[in-house]
Regions:
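A short helix->loop->beta-strand "cap" motif at the edges of active sites that frequently abuts
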Residues: 24, 81-82, 144-148
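General beta-strand structural signal in soluble alpha/beta enzymes
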Residues: 2-5, 26-29, 60, 86, ...
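Glycine-rich phosphate/diphosphate-binding loop of Rossmann-like nucleotide-binding domains
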Residues: 36-127
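Short, ordered loop/turn segments at secondary-structure junctions
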Residues: 5-8, 29-32, 89-91, 131-132, ...
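General structural feature for long, well-ordered alpha-helical segments within catalytic domains
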Residues: 10-14, 18, 22, 34, ...
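Glycine/serine-rich phosphate-binding loop and adjoining beta1-alpha1 elements at the start
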Residues: 2-56
Length: 167
């Protein structure tokens, strides 16, 4: 069964219940399809930039189903848990932050960063699954040398390729 266009947290609940009740594969494209393609792109970009997956720092902007699935797959592929910072519309998802639901709280880490601008400094990878224009040229400049930027917001990206090229 291929699930499509079901928002979090409903998608997690529906997928889990279907997997419990059915003896056939269940695939939520928004989560798993996005994660598979993004990991493939990351592996390619790391090869080109000569960076190692075990050493990179990633900032994931967005905390929906696709962001969580990408984060899980990145971790399962060798990115250290402490090297992934997830940011939602209220800021960094950190341990001790109030009002995190059970799904978001699973991605909370120990960090002093509270904003995207703080978290992005020195990052090797930006994965945007959020909103148009959220990543600025100033933020790109603050990233590591040869940063990897996946601006995947739909329909308009977090930053345009033209803006990145100006940096």
């Amino acid at each position: 069964i291929n699930l499509e266009d079901i928002a979090a947290p409903d998608c997690f609940i529906i997928e889990e219940k279907l997997k419990e009740k059915l003896d056939i594969p269940v695939f939520h494209d928004d989560q798993h399809g996005t994660a598979i393609i993004t990991l493939a792109a990351l592996i390619n970009a790391l090869d080109i930039s000569k960076k190692l997956i075990k050493d990179i720092k990633i900032v994931v902007n967005g905390a929906g189903a696709s962001a969580m699935a990408c984060t899980n797959l990145f971790k399962n592929s060798g990115v250290k848990n402490e090297n992934i910072i997830m940011v939602d519309r209220k800021g960094v998802i950190y341990r001790g932050r109030d009002n995190l639901n059970q799904w978001k709280s699973a991605y909370a880490i120990e960090t002093k960063h509270r904003t995207l601008e703080e978290a992005i400094k020195g990052a090797d990878v930006f994965l945007g699954l959020s909103a148009k224009g959220i990543l600025t040229k100033k933020m790109v400049k603050s990233m590591s040398k040869n940063p990897i930027i996946f601006a995947c917001a739909n329909p308009d990206p977090e930053i345009t390729p033209e803006e990145v090229n100006e940096v």
